[in-house]
Amino acid sequence: MASWGIETIGLLAGVLGIVAWGPQLRQVWVEGRHDGISLPTFAIVTVALVLWLVYGLLVDSVAMVLANTVTIAIIAAIIVGVVRLRRAEGSP
């Protein structure tokens, strides 16, 4: 398969991966709910995404770099929102 075809598949996967976090971002920032969100799980996912980002940089994959950078930003926003909500409620 041509290089552009492989990168296109990566971009499509990246877009779907980004969109997948939308419902939780909405739950936290629009609905103001944090139930069911595990911060330790988000921390592990963030570490995995950073490693994928580094890998993408090393293999020069635009799709991996873009998708993981945007996803890390979205997850950071979710984590910040959850921490703010929990502090406002006085829960750990």
What are these regions (language model features)?
Residues 1-92:
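Alpha-helical membrane-protein topology signature
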